[in-house]
Amino acid sequence: MNKLIQSKLELLPTSPGCYIHKDKNGTIIYVGKAKNLRNRVRSYFRGSHDTKTEALVSEIVDFEFIVTESNIEALLLEINLIKENKPKYNIMLKDDKSYPFIKITNETYPRLIITRQVKKDGGLYFGPYPDVGAANEIKRLLDRLFPFRKCTNPPEKVCFYYHLGQCKAHTICQVDSQYFKDLAQEVAAFLKGQDDQIIEDLRGKMAGAAQTMEFEKAAEYRDLIQSIGTLRTKQRVMAKDLQNRDVFGYYVDKGWMCVQVFFVRQGKLIERDVNLFPYYNDPDEDFLTYIGQFYQEKSHLKPNEILIPADIDEEAVRAMVDTKVLKPQRGEKKQLVNLAIKNARVSLQQKFDLLEKSIEKTQGAIENLGQLLNIPTPVRIESFDNSNIMGTSPVSAMVVFVNGKPSKKDYRKYKIKTVVGPDDYASMREVIKRRYSRVIRDGLTPPDLIVIDGGQGQVNVAKEVIQEQLGLDIPIAGLQKNDKHQTHELLFGDPLQVVELSRNSQEFFLLQRIQDEVHRFAITFHRQLRSKNSFSSQLDGIEGLGPKRKQNLMKHFKSLTKIKEASVDEIVEVGVPRAVAEAVQEKLNLKTQEQQQARLREVAEPQAEIE
């Protein structure tokens, strides 16, 4: 589990919603739902799992989540996201089964059934649902509300369901087939969220039963009303009109704005776009600017309708986008906007929480490091590393970390001037003396800790210069690497000793970042210098081609290869006389031929045996 996931897990809300797992390429590999996002997402990274889930977890590099108002919203949002993104592990973990539907069969006396196959058989299909459990839960409620046929084979006498009021016993009692057609339409309306009339009828029956003192029956009606309230399928993540619309919501805090856009297609929320950025003007104005820029991108097609918060100028949006723009005040559309705003608030808060945790961890790391080494908190740390290959172009580099963060304006590069050949100790001695002589001379701020990328020899050389030659009192530590070139151990003290440091501690991670950064900075400088020297050496000795013209050539063509490929006329255009341009081409092409011939000789000649 990487540090980003570790931090985000601590900040998950306990709300229901959907979570979205991504791999190293940012591809969605799994979408899931949860009644409690915190508990569910954390469970992936704790304990043991079956083989398939272990494979999923091994690929997770990041995750996102969308908060919903209820678990049923999460169910429906999950299926929409899965259908849209087709994550590979959703297919694997569900054993390649298709999703369940609730079906009203096309029979004279229809039945309510659950099926995974949608056929053109005249039946009415509702769904799909994310799993059989969700479909069964809704079907059980429908069975109690609508008296469809329950039996596959007609019984000879009325069945148990008839006495429960859940069947009309059509084979025994005369029931008009039109009754079931009307019943099917009622179910369709109910599943589309048109349940107000049903609830009103149930309330009337409940009141009637209570008046006649049939309290058990009244309790049954009460339970039915509560079940509808729990399982009603009129969801904020679903729209009844099957319209294509974009829903905008935003939230601002501490100079930052988060904009969330929900993409509703055919009435279903299939995707969302999240963007966080600092705002500098009036939030409403910056939000308007964002919408205008949003639809300038070719990937964002204008929908039939845009929903925006109530405090935004709809005429301004309409002028920019030229489509229907609404500021809903109530109902389903208002709930969609509220959901977008809620998710914007959650995303922005998560950013601040992650930032705060990062600051806390970094501050804690430098404080703990000071305690570990028994020195004042090392607010400013300067670190050094040397780089050379077989003594060629030896360089050194210094990086600076202030309050645990890189201070790149303070980085310094050093060309080694007094050392001949690959002498790491002498190079370190030169650079430390140059750096801290200048600190003394110019009155610069000295560091609280010097970290040397190296072992005992390099650290002792640095201590000799700092303490004995310059008379400074600056703590010096060393970072040794293992045979895999990874940060291995911390050296400190007089005499130097290995400091016990947990590899999972924030102090270790801080030192590791410092060592990786100084190594990167040094080796990048060394490569740049070698490339420049190689370029200069191949162009040396050409009459009329001085340092300025060499620099202009490199600036224009970027590399020797590009210069070799250029024509004489193209070189002349850079400001090089034609005779000199011809000499450049001749020398570079001759050099290339010599290199090719040398490689051919190497292949042809037998290699010396290694003893």
Swiss-Prot record:
GO biological process, one term: nucleotide-excision repair
Subunit structure: Interacts with UvrB in an incision complex.
InterPro entries, sorted: GIY-YIG_endonuc (IPR000305), GIY-YIG_endonuc_sf (IPR035901), GIY-YIG_UvrC_Cho (IPR047296), RuvA_2-like (IPR010994), UVR_dom (IPR001943), UVR_dom_sf (IPR036876), UvrABC_protein_C (IPR050066), UvrC (IPR004791)
UVR domain mapped to chain residues: 196-231
Organism: Streptococcus gordonii (strain Challis / ATCC 35105 / BCRC 15272 / CH1 / DL1 / V288)
Signal peptide: none
Family: Belongs to the UvrC family.
Intracellular or extracellular location(s): Cytoplasm
Claim: DNA damage is one of the keywords in the record: yes
Domain GIY-YIG positions: 14-91
Domain of life where this protein originates: Bacteria
Broad class of the protein's primary localization: cytoplasm
PANTHER family: UVRABC SYSTEM PROTEIN C, UVRC/OXIDOREDUCTASE
GO terms, molecular function: DNA binding; excinuclease ABC activity
Keyword Plastid: no
Gene behind the chain: uvrC
Pfam family, any one: UvrC_RNaseH
Function of the protein: The UvrABC repair system catalyzes the recognition and processing of DNA lesions. UvrC both incises the 5' and 3' sides of the lesion. The N-terminal half is responsible for the 3' incision and the C-terminal half is responsible for the 5' incision.
Protein name per UniProt: UvrABC system protein C
Keyword terms of this UniProt record: Cytoplasm, DNA damage, DNA excision, DNA repair, Excision nuclease, SOS response
Any one GO cellular component localisation term in the record: excinuclease repair complex
